[in-house]
């Protein structure tokens, strides 16, 4: 396979959030869909032997948080995906800042009950400085949550970035009915996938089928959805790929990482909206990825995973995709 084709199928993104927003749980659900793991370990309940795959240090297993950046790779629908799972806790932010230098885009995870939090703001500013496209996943809709319009307003006012909801929640917590896909014009009805399982038995209803939709979610939720759709279509920003790529507009998705609801839809929309790695700039101009010289940026050195050091690097140039220097 040629170097050019290898580049085109790659997607490298970081996941950023405030602690406990669900970042590591979302990462594991991505790995489930890529077939990299068969059972997701929730970051809750660390007294058991089941831990999150991206949390490999003993302190991470004990505390249920990420304290170092993990680099995870899997294949999905023809894409080779690299996830940079970054620490959310402020004490370990230096590792996060360095890792963001290697990301082509970022997924910002927000707790629906808490909104934009302190560490999210700090990490967001780093992404803005680097002009990284940012995609927002508003998590934990299966719990009590803030009003979705208020969440959008908070993202825009606090972070200073325009929002474009790609899907829209119907209820929350015990009354969470599902999400409306604004692009596909259908409703995915909520049903949780528990115990780390991959499959979600999702029923999808055409949004124009009023009788069926009312039967599934009830008259009150149906009427509220129609009001929300009308307001969104009239007031929210339209999707603009150039603005997304420039980091001026963030597509917003709602779901629940813990119950695996909305994760696959988010992943597929995300892959369709992102681009393959672009040539990097240096103080001597744009770096040609097809040059014969080898160059890379080492953004992490891990000495604790096993006896041998493992370096994580962003490859700038290489004569061959199978170059032994990079193996």
Residues covered by each model-derived region:
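Structural and coupling elements of P-loop NTPases
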Residues: 1-318, 322
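N-terminal low-complexity segments that are often proline-rich with Ser/Thr-Pro
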Residues: 324-327
């Amino acid at each position: 396979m040629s170097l050019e084709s290898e580049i085109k199928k790659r997607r490298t993104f970081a996941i950023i959030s405030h602690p406990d927003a669900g970042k590591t749980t979302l990462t594991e659900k991505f790995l489930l869909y890529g077939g990299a793991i068969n059972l997701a370990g929730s970051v809750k309940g660390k007294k058991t032997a089941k831990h999150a795959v991206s949390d490999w240090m003993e302190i991470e297993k004990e505390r249920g948080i990420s304290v170092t950046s993990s680099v995870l790779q899997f294949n999905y629908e023809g894409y080779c995906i690299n996830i940079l799972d970054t620490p959310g806790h402020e004490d370990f932010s230096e590792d996060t800042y360095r890792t963001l230098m290697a990301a082509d885009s970022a997924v910002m995870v927000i707790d629906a009950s808490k909104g934009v939090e302190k560490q999210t703001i700090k990490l967001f500013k780093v992404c803005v400085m680097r002009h990284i496209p940012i995609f927002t996943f508003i998590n934990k809709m299966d719990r009590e949550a803030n009003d979705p319009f208020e969440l959008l307003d908070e993202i825009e006012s606090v972070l200073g970035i325009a929002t474009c909801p790609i899907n829209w929640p119907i209820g929350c917590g015990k009354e969470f009915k599902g999400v409306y896909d604004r692009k596909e014009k259908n409703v995915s009805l909520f049903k949780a996938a528990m115990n780390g399982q991959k499959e979600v038995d999702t029923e999808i209803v055409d949004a124009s089928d009023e009788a069926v939709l009312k039967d599934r979610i009830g008259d009150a939720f149906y009427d509220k959805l129609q009001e929300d759709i009308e307001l969104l279509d009239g007031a929210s920003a339209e999707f603009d790929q150039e603005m997304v790529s420039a980091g001026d507009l963030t597509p917003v998705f709602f779901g629940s990482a813990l119950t695996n609801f909305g994760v696959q839809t988010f992943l597929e929309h995300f892959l369709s909206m992102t681009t393959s790695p672009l040539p990097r700039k240096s103080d001597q101009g744009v770096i040609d990825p097809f040059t014969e010289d080898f160059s890379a940026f080492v953004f992490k050195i891990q000495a604790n995973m096993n006896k041998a050091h493992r370096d994580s690097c962003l490859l700038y140039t290489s004569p061959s995709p199978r170059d032994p220097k990079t193996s």
